[in-house]
Regions:
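PLP-dependent class I/II
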Residues: 1-185
Length: 185
């Protein structure tokens, strides 16, 4: 991908309309593994601030990065418009447990709590205990294993002549199939 799956002011602007209420920011990205650069984050920040949009930051792969990573939470002047979403399943290998949390300004949390009370009764106790224990776990050995696997698969794809962006996070590789006359449809 020419832009390395980064967000540019131009490609973001063409997708924002008068009906837009929020931007969903997924970094590291699923399925590309791209980690957004400070320039990409700045582009989102400028548009969100100018258009008074919420930014939902899907950070479920934030602990699974292979280099520099910056959280969107650094933009404190729009703090009331930022919702950080985190999961236990990806960083702690608890796939299928469907347990997570979010961080947001108090008025946002109060509104989300109302919604939550009508959609979820409670998390089962063993999930709560497992997630609490996971917070004491250091995921860096798992991240190093993912890095080795990423490097191996990436290297093999490149050796086979595939065009693929080396993922900066998560555990996905997203090869291009365009040169084979195929598209994603």
């Amino acid at each position: 991908c020419a832009d390395h799956f980064q967000i540019t002011p131009q490609n973001l602007a063409q997708h924002i309309t008068a009906k837009s209420k929020a931007i969903l920011l997924n970094s590291p990205n699923n399925p590309t593994g791209a980690v957004y650069t400070p320039e990409s984050l700045d582009a989102v920040y400028q548009v969100a601030k100018e258009k008074n949009l919420f930014v939902l930051c899907d950070n479920v792969y934030a602990q699974l990065v292979y280099g520099p990573y910056q959280s969107f939470s650094r933009y404190q002047d729009i703090r009331e418009k930022i919702i950080l979403i985190q999961s236990f399943s990806k960083p702690y290998a608890m796939t299928g447990w469907r347990m997570g949390y979010l961080c947001a300004d108090r008025p946002v949390i109060e509104q989300l709590a109302k919604l939550h009370s009508y959609t979820v009764v409670s998390a089962v106790s063993f999930l709560q205990k497992g997630c609490a224990a996971a917070l004491d776990y250091d995921p860096s050995p798992m991240v190093e294993t993912y890095r080795r696997r990423r490097d191996y698969v990436y290297g093999r794809l490149v050796e086979m002549g595939m065009e693929v962006q080396k993922p900066q996070g998560a555990f996905y590789l997203f090869p291009s199939i365009q040169k084979y006359g195929m598209d994603s449809e």
